[in-house]
Amino acid sequence: MDIAPYKKPEYFRNRELSWVSFDERVLNEARDKSIPLFERLKFISITSSNLDEFYMVRVASLKDQVHANYTKKDLSGMDAKEQLAGISKRTHELVQLQYNTYNRSAVPSLEHVGLTIISEHEKLTKEQAEYVDSYFEENIYPVLTPMAMDSARPFPLIRNKTLNIGALVQKKEDSLLSRAEDKKEKKGKEKEKEKELEFATVQVPSVLPRFILLPQDEKTGQRYVILLEEIIERNIGKLFLSYDVVCAH
């Protein structure tokens, strides 16, 4: 029996794109409203963690092949560059669908059962802001380690599968003047005044819960939660006392 015809590329599916299809099916479970709400949220989380692992292992391997100029095609007839292009297109669509599912389905459903997620710290009420600032001082600040980058300090090592906040900071004017006077560099004083942007990172600690529960609204009975990184972003200026924080995300 001649099996050669069955080796045609059209008879095979690319392994990596097949995996993306699997993750799409997982996300479809999160879109099924017959499934309990918190189970649907778990499926969104699983989709995200699967995608992280996929990029860390499989996509990294394909990029290594491209860098090594390895051009052999797989059984589906795709080389590494073609696979990466296909993966990029499909995963962009997957992530967009993931965010749509979370924002348009999961979040409204949570609000309907009395739990509101505050997505931006600017939306906090005065009482909530006071609570999260106190929580930051007591629980978050002691476990944070900000890292800056400049000509003397290379880009900091960021661990896999960690959440980090990036910030652009500038030396405060009074600090620049003080530094110039201490060095007695009168001729270069104007140059010292020039503010240069510096990049800094803050790793969101994994030892703390990602979602922080805020006090219940006594009038409506509604409960509120805010993301840990939003609290850090709100208070990030406390980590760089000699700097102005231009932006942080």
Predicted regions located by residue number:
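NTP/phosphate- and nucleic-acid-binding module
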Residues: 1
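Extended, highly charged clamp/arch subdomains and adjacent linkers
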Residues: 4-12, 17-39, 52-249
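Nucleic acid-processing catalytic cores of prokaryotic defense/repair systems
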Residues: 46-49
